[in-house]
Amino acid sequence: ITCVMKEYTPEFDQMLFYLPLSGSTFKKVYYDEFLERAVSKFVPAEQLIVPYTATDLETAENVTHVIQISENELRKKQVAGFYLDIEVSASQSDPSEIREEMDEISGVSPNHLDQEITLLECHVDLDLEGYEDIGDNGEPTGIKLPYVVTISENNGKLLSIRRNYSPDDPGHKKN
């Protein structure tokens, strides 16, 4: 893990540092198309939005990851076709009290040179027209399927909709 995932140890160390301060932390492991390998990232609890009634992330109807991304990184992903090539402006919102307190405790200060864009990566179940779940009788079942929908927090523009299940899986389980 640490030989291939160069970010694993620093991300894990950062997660362990934040754990006593926040009470909860998360790891996001996913395949990165640009690096062409699995990646493991630390996600602070304040960057994960989960319904109050959810008992776990696996069965939650929606989970939203608040992603801070630089204009340059977003542009790279747009040029590569990962996100739609549309204009998205940097977020104008001030950091939350939680973020300011965590930054102060950890000795980090925000960099105002590179404007960050806030994206909302929503892991949701949807019944999309033209992509419905089809039953044995060939008719749509009305069952919602798992997707990852990414939008800009600043203006609500849609950047991507990606299937979050294997096309070979008849049960359409979340990846």
Tell me the role of every PLM-derived stretch:
Residues 1-175:
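Extended alpha-helical, oligomerization-prone segments that build pores/tubes and scaffolds
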